[in-house]
């Protein structure tokens, strides 16, 4: 059984990557970063696309694609409704409420803290395939804007994915197993949060400024975002190909001439 990067490496001249990177070099740099347990574990774009290939169910595939295209935390993605998406050209986007802010809203509902303005972040949806597939899913599965809560009897905004975090982990596990059965394996463990890390690294490879990425990720502190640059710095340094050596005899001649 071979790892996914091997066949892609051999076919790299014929494959168009979504972001222009030296894929074999990026793989090598990721393997280097995995030595440090504190650094994020992420997949590269070809690996994510390959994983999605093994998710035939449209609803499941689009949840994982949403994590990949938005960098959302799993609870943020599971809270999404149709109204959170604006798919109108030329700038489709999704509105996400961050983990901390959603927790505060729940606390206010329980009467434990005063109400305040709930902050959301807007994440552009720049991938046309993703937007098209999302529209197809909504139309095909007839996902409603609202539905009646059977427990309370109230009409509420309908969540697109009425599942739990554990269910999503099961979906991912099934996809990884299906890939392995087909001879495709992944170098890092895949969890819902892996897609968030993968989004961040993909955006850095695409040249997105760090402060912009901080906003897209919903990080309160820039230090949370800077962890990705610790990995990305390896790529930057490698691409510059900084040399340290020169012919020793030439160096000696230079120094002698300096004193001539």
Curated annotation (Swiss-Prot):
Report the function annotation for this chain. This resolvase acts at the RfsF equivalent resolution sequence of pColBM-CL139.
Highest classification ranks of the organism? Bacteria, Pseudomonadati, Pseudomonadota, Gammaproteobacteria, Enterobacterales
Name under which the protein is recorded:
Resolvase
Q: Where is the Tyr recombinase domain?
A: 38-241
One Pfam family, please name it: Phage_integrase
- Some GO term, biological process aspect, for this entry: which one? DNA integration
Gene Ontology molecular function terms on file = DNA binding
Catalytic residues of the enzyme: 73, 105, 193, 196, 219, 228 (o-(3'-phospho-dna)-tyrosine intermediate)
What protein family does this chain belong to?
Answer: Belongs to the 'phage' integrase family.
What are the record keywords, sorted?
Answer: DNA integration, DNA recombination, Plasmid, Repressor, Transcription, Transcription regulation
Per its UniProt record, what PROSITE patterns does this chain match? TYR_RECOMBINASE
């Amino acid at each position: 059984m071979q790892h996914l990067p091997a066949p892609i490496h051999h076919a790299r001249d014929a494959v168009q990557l979504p972001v222009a990177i030296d894929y074999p070099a990026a793989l090598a740099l990721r393997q280097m970063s995995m030595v440090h347990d504190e650094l994020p574990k992420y997949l590269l774009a070809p690996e994510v696309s390959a994983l999605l290939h093994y998710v035939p169910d449209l609803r499941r595939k689009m949840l994982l694609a949403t994590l990949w295209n938005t960098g959302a935390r799993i609870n943020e993605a599971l809270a999404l409704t149709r109204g959170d998406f604006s798919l109108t050209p030329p700038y489709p986007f999704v509105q996400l409420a961050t983990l901390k802010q959603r927790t505060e809203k729940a606390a206010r509902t329980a009467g434990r803290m005063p109400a305040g303005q709930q902050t959301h972040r807007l994440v552009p949806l720049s991938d046309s395939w993703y937007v098209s597939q999302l529209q197809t899913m909504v139309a095909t599965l007839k996902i409603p804007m609202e539905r009646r809560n059977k427990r309370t009897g109230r009409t509420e905004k309908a969540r697109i994915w009425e599942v739990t975090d554990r269910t999503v982990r099961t979906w991912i596990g099934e996809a990884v197993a299906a890939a392995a059965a087909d001879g495709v394996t992944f170098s890092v463990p895949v969890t819902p949060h892996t897609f968030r890390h993968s989004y961040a690294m993909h955006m850095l490879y695409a040249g997105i400024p760090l402060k912009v990425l901080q906003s897209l990720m919903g990080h309160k502190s820039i230090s949370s975002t800077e962890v990705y640059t610790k990995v990305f710095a390896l790529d930057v340094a490698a691409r510059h190909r900084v040399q340290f050596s020169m012919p020793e005899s030439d160096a000696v001649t230079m120094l002698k001439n300096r004193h001539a």
